[in-house]
Amino acid sequence: MLNTLIVGASGYAGAELVTYVNRHPHMNITALTVSAQSNDAGKLISDLHPQLKGIVDLPLQPMSDISEFSPGVDVVFLATAHEVSHDLAPQFLEAGCVVFDLSGAFRVNDATFYEKYYGFTHQYPELLEQAAYGLAEWCGNKLKEANLIAVPGCYPTAAQLALKPLIDADLLDLNQWPVINATSGVSGAGRKAAISNSFCEVSLQPYGVFTHRHQPEIATHLGADVIFTPHLGNFPRGILETITCRLKSGVTQAQVAQVLQQAYAHKPLVRLYDKGVPALKNVVGLPFCDIGFAVQGEHLIIVATEDNLLKGAAAQAVQCANIRFGYAETQSLI
């Protein structure tokens, strides 16, 4: 049994982690924590997230020193802000824990990336070298030996799952950069109240045009330039990405289908559509990424959907933990 600590459990992704870890037959929740300054400190997780009432009624404990919580802990999930994860991960690693970080603090092995896109100076370049990028379907072997796993961002997960097999198979003409138009539900912005996310203000709108930090994450791990435009949707959760690409001359729809099938035939959390394209409602609340596509001449449109809090965060983190510790990949997820 893996003793498991969830840090930042009060947020949306944190609550989903609580759900998955609680029902995992090989994990035991030792504590749920929030920052010492959090207004949620001392509250029950089930008071903040009533879907957990009668299932997990543990208190959210304030954490100011990891030594209060790290003894005897095998696994730590960090559902915390980037700067917080940056500071906490090394301490938990030093304490002998395996760390799964849902923030962006260790996703890209380039310290200058964090100054430019995250606004802080990275102090642990050696951990950037050591961290395994947790795109579970593609990086499984690296995960098995890693003690620090950087869980990919929500947008990059869907984008890479859709594009990586096609790029690796050399089917795309990358002189025309893939264009990724992605829309996410409001939960992607977290639980903290903001006027722009309030019911009467939220509207379908692009944001972070040419500046969003997920663009370089996607491009770095794909090894290909992309144009990425995120949009805020007026719905609670889920991500839908419409990706436009150019195929190399002579590449057929059958070849695209074959490459995707070969990539994901034995990957249970990626579902391929033989016909048509996926709808968001079919993945919300589920740990899958659904992918469909259409071809017209040399033009390819791929549609990928996922729940941003699940396959885009908590479910993928648990999927990575299952791979790391040798459990069935879908344990506690489906």
Swiss-Prot record:
Enzyme Commission numbers on file: 1.2.1.38
Reported function: Catalyzes the NADPH-dependent reduction of N-acetyl-5-glutamyl phosphate to yield N-acetyl-L-glutamate 5-semialdehyde.
Originating organism: Escherichia coli (strain K12)
Keywords: Amino-acid biosynthesis, Arginine biosynthesis, Cytoplasm, NADP, Oxidoreductase
Native organism taxonomy: Bacteria, Pseudomonadati, Pseudomonadota, Gammaproteobacteria, Enterobacterales
Entry protein name: N-acetyl-gamma-glutamyl-phosphate reductase
Similarity comment: family membership: Belongs to the NAGSA dehydrogenase family. Type 1 subfamily.
GO biological process, one term: L-arginine biosynthetic process
Catalytic reactions on record: N-acetyl-L-glutamate 5-semialdehyde + phosphate + NADP(+) = N-acetyl-L-glutamyl 5-phosphate + NADPH + H(+)
